[in-house]
Protein backbone atom coordinates (compact mmCIF):
# COMPACT_ATOMS: atom_id res chain seq x y z
CA UNK A 1 0.00 0.00 0.00
CA UNK A 2 2.86 2.39 0.82
CA UNK A 3 4.44 1.63 -2.56
CA UNK A 4 1.17 2.40 -4.37
CA UNK A 5 0.82 5.69 -2.50
CA UNK A 6 4.38 6.68 -3.38
CA UNK A 7 3.87 5.71 -7.02
CA UNK A 8 0.68 7.79 -7.18
CA UNK A 9 2.55 10.76 -5.70
CA UNK A 10 5.27 10.48 -8.34
CA UNK A 11 2.95 10.06 -11.31
CA UNK A 12 0.49 12.88 -10.64
CA UNK A 13 1.81 15.96 -12.54
CA UNK A 14 2.60 18.88 -10.27
CA UNK A 15 1.58 16.99 -7.12
CA UNK A 16 3.30 18.71 -4.21
CA UNK A 17 6.46 19.24 -6.25
CA UNK A 18 8.59 22.37 -6.04
CA UNK A 19 11.35 23.73 -8.23
CA UNK A 20 14.57 24.72 -6.50
CA UNK A 21 17.93 26.14 -7.52
CA UNK A 22 19.15 22.56 -8.02
CA UNK A 23 16.98 22.43 -11.16
CA UNK A 24 18.19 25.85 -12.36
CA UNK A 25 21.89 25.23 -12.83
CA UNK A 26 22.24 26.07 -16.53
CA UNK A 27 21.07 29.10 -18.57
CA UNK A 28 18.85 26.80 -20.64
CA UNK A 29 17.13 25.44 -17.54
CA UNK A 30 16.51 28.97 -16.27
CA UNK A 31 15.10 30.20 -19.59
CA UNK A 32 12.74 27.22 -19.81
CA UNK A 33 11.55 27.93 -16.27
CA UNK A 34 11.05 31.65 -16.95
CA UNK A 35 9.01 30.88 -20.05
CA UNK A 36 6.85 28.45 -18.07
CA UNK A 37 6.39 30.89 -15.20
CA UNK A 38 4.74 33.41 -17.55
CA UNK A 39 1.69 31.14 -17.57
CA UNK A 40 0.98 32.38 -14.03
CA UNK A 41 0.36 35.89 -15.40
CA UNK A 42 -3.02 36.25 -17.17
CA UNK A 43 -1.65 39.09 -19.31
CA UNK A 44 1.23 36.98 -20.62
CA UNK A 45 -0.35 33.54 -21.05
CA UNK A 46 -0.43 32.37 -24.66
CA UNK A 47 -4.00 31.07 -24.33
CA UNK A 48 -6.50 32.77 -22.06
CA UNK A 49 -9.81 34.60 -21.97
CA UNK A 50 -10.38 36.84 -18.98
CA UNK A 51 -12.01 40.07 -17.81
CA UNK A 52 -9.68 42.47 -16.03
CA UNK A 53 -9.96 45.65 -14.01
CA UNK A 54 -6.98 47.91 -14.66
CA UNK A 55 -6.31 51.07 -12.69
CA UNK A 56 -3.27 53.13 -13.85
CA UNK A 57 -2.15 56.38 -12.25
CA UNK A 58 0.77 58.79 -12.05
CA UNK A 59 2.39 60.56 -9.10
CA UNK A 60 -0.04 62.30 -6.73
CA UNK A 61 -3.13 60.83 -8.41
CA UNK A 62 -2.17 57.40 -7.06
CA UNK A 63 -2.86 58.56 -3.51
CA UNK A 64 -6.37 59.80 -4.24
CA UNK A 65 -9.08 58.08 -2.19
CA UNK A 66 -11.23 57.80 -5.30
CA UNK A 67 -8.30 56.75 -7.48
CA UNK A 68 -9.59 53.27 -8.31
CA UNK A 69 -13.00 54.43 -9.50
CA UNK A 70 -11.65 57.49 -11.32
CA UNK A 71 -8.92 55.64 -13.23
CA UNK A 72 -10.44 52.17 -13.54
CA UNK A 73 -10.95 50.51 -16.89
CA UNK A 74 -12.61 47.15 -17.39
CA UNK A 75 -11.44 45.13 -20.36
CA UNK A 76 -11.77 41.70 -21.85
CA UNK A 77 -8.47 40.07 -22.84
CA UNK A 78 -8.30 37.23 -25.34
CA UNK A 79 -4.99 35.60 -26.23
CA UNK A 80 -4.51 32.76 -28.71
CA UNK A 81 -0.87 31.89 -29.31
CA UNK A 82 0.76 35.04 -30.79
CA UNK A 83 -2.53 36.92 -31.25
CA UNK A 84 -4.26 39.04 -28.63
CA UNK A 85 -7.36 41.23 -28.38
CA UNK A 86 -8.01 43.82 -25.68
CA UNK A 87 -11.63 45.00 -25.72
CA UNK A 88 -12.33 47.95 -23.40
CA UNK A 89 -15.73 47.47 -21.76
CA UNK A 90 -15.79 50.38 -19.28
CA UNK A 91 -13.73 53.53 -18.92
CA UNK A 92 -12.48 56.31 -21.18
CA UNK A 93 -11.82 53.87 -24.04
CA UNK A 94 -15.09 51.99 -23.79
CA UNK A 95 -16.02 50.12 -27.03
CA UNK A 96 -12.48 50.47 -28.41
CA UNK A 97 -10.10 47.54 -28.81
CA UNK A 98 -6.46 46.74 -29.53
CA UNK A 99 -5.66 43.74 -31.69
CA UNK A 100 -2.26 42.16 -32.11
CA UNK A 101 -1.76 39.70 -34.94
CA UNK A 102 1.81 38.47 -34.81
CA UNK A 103 3.98 41.57 -35.26
CA UNK A 104 1.11 43.86 -36.25
CA UNK A 105 -0.88 46.03 -33.82
CA UNK A 106 -4.21 47.60 -34.74
CA UNK A 107 -6.47 49.96 -32.85
CA UNK A 108 -10.21 49.76 -33.56
CA UNK A 109 -12.62 52.54 -32.63
CA UNK A 110 -15.82 50.47 -32.65
CA UNK A 111 -15.76 46.96 -31.20
CA UNK A 112 -18.32 44.57 -29.80
CA UNK A 113 -18.34 41.00 -28.57
CA UNK A 114 -18.68 39.90 -32.19
CA UNK A 115 -16.74 42.32 -34.41
CA UNK A 116 -14.03 44.98 -34.79
CA UNK A 117 -14.57 48.07 -36.94
CA UNK A 118 -12.80 51.32 -37.87
CA UNK A 119 -9.33 49.83 -37.36
CA UNK A 120 -5.92 51.34 -38.12
CA UNK A 121 -2.33 50.22 -37.64
CA UNK A 122 -0.13 51.39 -34.77
CA UNK A 123 3.66 51.87 -34.92
CA UNK A 124 5.63 48.71 -34.21
CA UNK A 125 7.10 50.34 -31.09
CA UNK A 126 3.66 50.22 -29.44
CA UNK A 127 3.19 46.51 -29.78
CA UNK A 128 4.68 45.31 -26.48
CA UNK A 129 3.13 47.84 -24.09
CA UNK A 130 -0.42 47.83 -22.81
CA UNK A 131 -1.36 51.36 -23.76
CA UNK A 132 -2.08 53.76 -20.93
CA UNK A 133 -0.12 51.63 -18.44
CA UNK A 134 3.49 50.84 -17.52
CA UNK A 135 3.01 47.13 -18.30
CA UNK A 136 5.34 46.02 -21.08
CA UNK A 137 5.71 42.41 -22.26
CA UNK A 138 9.18 43.32 -23.53
CA UNK A 139 10.32 43.45 -19.89
CA UNK A 140 9.65 39.72 -19.65
CA UNK A 141 11.29 38.95 -22.99
CA UNK A 142 14.50 40.54 -21.66
CA UNK A 143 14.65 37.89 -18.95
CA UNK A 144 15.18 35.11 -21.49
CA UNK A 145 17.88 36.61 -23.70
CA UNK A 146 20.62 34.12 -24.59
CA UNK A 147 23.28 36.67 -23.58
CA UNK A 148 21.99 36.89 -20.00
CA UNK A 149 23.82 35.61 -16.95
CA UNK A 150 21.92 33.86 -14.16
CA UNK A 151 22.52 32.99 -10.52
CA UNK A 152 20.07 31.29 -8.17
CA UNK A 153 20.08 31.33 -4.36
CA UNK A 154 17.83 29.61 -1.85
CA UNK A 155 16.44 31.87 0.88
CA UNK A 156 17.23 30.29 4.24
CA UNK A 157 15.11 32.81 6.15
CA UNK A 158 12.19 32.39 3.72
CA UNK A 159 11.85 28.67 2.95
CA UNK A 160 9.67 27.97 -0.07
CA UNK A 161 11.12 30.88 -2.04
CA UNK A 162 14.31 31.49 -4.00
CA UNK A 163 16.10 34.48 -5.52
CA UNK A 164 17.13 34.65 -9.17
CA UNK A 165 19.60 37.33 -10.27
CA UNK A 166 19.71 38.07 -13.99
CA UNK A 167 22.42 40.11 -15.70
CA UNK A 168 21.30 41.80 -18.94
CA UNK A 169 23.38 43.59 -21.56
CA UNK A 170 22.43 46.05 -24.30
CA UNK A 171 18.95 46.87 -22.94
CA UNK A 172 17.11 49.51 -20.94
CA UNK A 173 17.71 47.48 -17.77
CA UNK A 174 20.99 45.78 -16.87
CA UNK A 175 19.89 43.67 -13.91
CA UNK A 176 16.77 41.94 -12.64
CA UNK A 177 16.41 40.49 -9.16
CA UNK A 178 13.43 38.16 -8.93
CA UNK A 179 11.90 36.24 -6.02
CA UNK A 180 9.88 33.12 -6.84
CA UNK A 181 7.43 30.88 -5.02
CA UNK A 182 9.00 27.41 -5.39
CA UNK A 183 5.77 25.40 -5.36
CA UNK A 184 3.55 27.65 -7.45
CA UNK A 185 6.33 28.88 -9.78
CA UNK A 186 5.00 32.45 -9.57
CA UNK A 187 7.32 35.48 -9.39
CA UNK A 188 6.42 37.31 -6.19
CA UNK A 189 8.53 40.27 -7.33
CA UNK A 190 10.50 41.18 -10.43
CA UNK A 191 12.82 44.11 -9.70
CA UNK A 192 14.34 45.86 -12.74
CA UNK A 193 17.52 47.92 -12.25
CA UNK A 194 19.56 50.35 -14.36
CA UNK A 195 23.05 51.20 -13.08
CA UNK A 196 22.07 49.93 -9.65
CA UNK A 197 18.91 52.08 -9.45
CA UNK A 198 15.54 50.36 -9.11
CA UNK A 199 13.37 51.42 -12.06
CA UNK A 200 10.37 49.09 -12.12
CA UNK A 201 8.75 46.45 -9.89
CA UNK A 202 6.21 43.81 -10.88
CA UNK A 203 4.63 42.40 -7.70
CA UNK A 204 2.10 39.63 -7.10
CA UNK A 205 0.45 38.70 -3.80
CA UNK A 206 0.34 35.07 -2.56
CA UNK A 207 -2.97 35.75 -0.82
CA UNK A 208 -4.54 36.17 -4.26
CA UNK A 209 -3.10 33.14 -6.07
CA UNK A 210 -5.65 30.85 -7.72
CA UNK A 211 -5.22 27.26 -8.91
CA UNK A 212 -7.01 26.12 -12.07
CA UNK A 213 -6.33 22.71 -13.61
CA UNK A 214 -3.07 22.40 -11.62
CA UNK A 215 -1.90 25.79 -12.91
CA UNK A 216 -1.37 28.59 -10.40
CA UNK A 217 -2.47 32.05 -11.53
CA UNK A 218 -1.89 35.44 -9.94
CA UNK A 219 -5.24 37.26 -9.79
CA UNK A 220 -3.75 40.58 -8.63
CA UNK A 221 -0.74 42.35 -10.14
CA UNK A 222 0.86 45.66 -9.18
CA UNK A 223 3.40 47.37 -11.44
CA UNK A 224 5.35 50.40 -10.22
CA UNK A 225 7.76 52.62 -12.12
CA UNK A 226 10.24 53.82 -9.52
CA UNK A 227 13.15 56.13 -8.77
CA UNK A 228 15.26 53.89 -6.59
CA UNK A 229 12.64 52.61 -4.15
CA UNK A 230 9.40 50.70 -4.58
CA UNK A 231 7.61 53.08 -2.23
CA UNK A 232 8.95 56.11 -4.11
CA UNK A 233 7.10 55.37 -7.32
CA UNK A 234 6.13 57.77 -10.10
CA UNK A 235 3.52 55.58 -11.81
CA UNK A 236 1.52 52.55 -10.83
CA UNK A 237 -0.85 50.10 -12.50
CA UNK A 238 -3.10 47.73 -10.54
CA UNK A 239 -4.58 44.72 -12.32
CA UNK A 240 -7.37 42.53 -10.94
CA UNK A 241 -9.10 39.56 -12.51
CA UNK A 242 -12.79 40.41 -12.28
CA UNK A 243 -15.14 38.14 -10.35
CA UNK A 244 -18.81 37.26 -10.46
CA UNK A 245 -19.42 36.45 -6.82
CA UNK A 246 -16.73 33.92 -5.92
CA UNK A 247 -16.04 32.87 -9.51
CA UNK A 248 -13.18 34.51 -11.39
CA UNK A 249 -13.77 35.49 -15.01
CA UNK A 250 -10.75 33.50 -16.14
CA UNK A 251 -10.67 30.68 -18.70
CA UNK A 252 -7.44 28.94 -19.67
CA UNK A 253 -9.29 27.49 -22.65
CA UNK A 254 -10.96 30.50 -24.33
CA UNK A 255 -13.68 28.30 -25.84
CA UNK A 256 -15.07 27.81 -22.32
CA UNK A 257 -15.68 31.53 -21.74
CA UNK A 258 -19.46 32.22 -21.81
CA UNK A 259 -18.68 35.66 -23.26
CA UNK A 260 -17.48 33.93 -26.44
CA UNK A 261 -20.29 31.39 -26.73
CA UNK A 262 -21.66 33.00 -29.93
CA UNK A 263 -18.29 33.40 -31.62
CA UNK A 264 -15.27 31.30 -32.49
CA UNK A 265 -12.42 32.99 -30.56
CA UNK A 266 -10.17 33.05 -33.63
CA UNK A 267 -12.73 35.16 -35.52
CA UNK A 268 -12.29 38.01 -33.05
CA UNK A 269 -8.94 38.88 -34.62
CA UNK A 270 -10.59 39.76 -37.94
CA UNK A 271 -10.66 43.51 -38.69
CA UNK A 272 -12.75 45.49 -41.18
Question: Where are the regions that the model predicts?
Answer:
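N-terminal signal peptide c-region/cleavage motif recognized by signal peptidases
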Residues: 13-16
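Sec-dependent signal peptide recognition
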Residues: 1-9
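Gly/Pro-enriched, hydrophobic low-complexity segments
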Residues: 157-255
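Flexible, processing/modification-adjacent segments and terminal tails
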Residues: 19-33, 100-176, 197, 254, ...
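A short, sequence-level motif marking secondary-structure junctions
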Residues: 77-82, 101-104, 124-130, 182-183, ...
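N-terminal mature ectodomain segment of secretory-pathway/periplasmic proteins
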Residues: 19-113, 148, 154, 239
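Short, surface-exposed beta-strand/loop "edge" segments at domain boundaries and coil↔beta transitions
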Residues: 58-64, 92-99, 109-120, 171-175, ...
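Extended low-complexity acidic/polar segments
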Residues: 91, 248-252, 264
Amino acid sequence: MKFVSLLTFLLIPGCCLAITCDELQSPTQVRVFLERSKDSNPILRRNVSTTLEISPCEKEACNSKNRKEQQKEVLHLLRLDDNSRVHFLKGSRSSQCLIQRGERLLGCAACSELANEACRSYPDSSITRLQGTNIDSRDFSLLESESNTYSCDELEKNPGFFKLEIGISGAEYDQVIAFFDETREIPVTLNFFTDGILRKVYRTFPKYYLQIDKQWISTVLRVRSTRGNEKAFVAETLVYIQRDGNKYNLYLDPKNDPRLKNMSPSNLFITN
